[in-house]
């Protein structure tokens, strides 16, 4: 009885996601991409512009974006039309095209920093030989998104990864191509990642006539 009287109740554990919006983060719309890109250009944020454009074009996970090395995209001193990066999660290489504006942004960034092959493309506060952390990258993404009037809680690093993949799927309906571009091993993963519903599939089917 005495033990029951003196017993103190355990503090209630606060759920990690309390007050946070969870679930899949939606892709950015083209107008949002252009707004962020324009703002970064006007503000002269060369690193952020190069990173944002690379994230959109590459469709890489955040952990792979921050691990990009100069030689991955600019082995010859100038940014190439195509690049190949080995994914940390799967160990599989994934190839992607780099648009002209992305190549220009990366070249401008390389000129301003003097970075050379053999170095990390994006470094953080831990020193020139250490990559930016995924947490730092996530904070940057939130900053970019909030700077154009969007709610950072609704979007995240995966929003950038999904953006171009979603546009490609909506315009072509080619799920296999999107699977390859995202580096997924199973097409079911791509279906879930894009949030494809039966209605979406049927709408695409109606456009195909044989």
Task: Please name every model-derived segment.
Residues 1-210:
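Conserved catalytic core of the tyrosine transesterase superfamily
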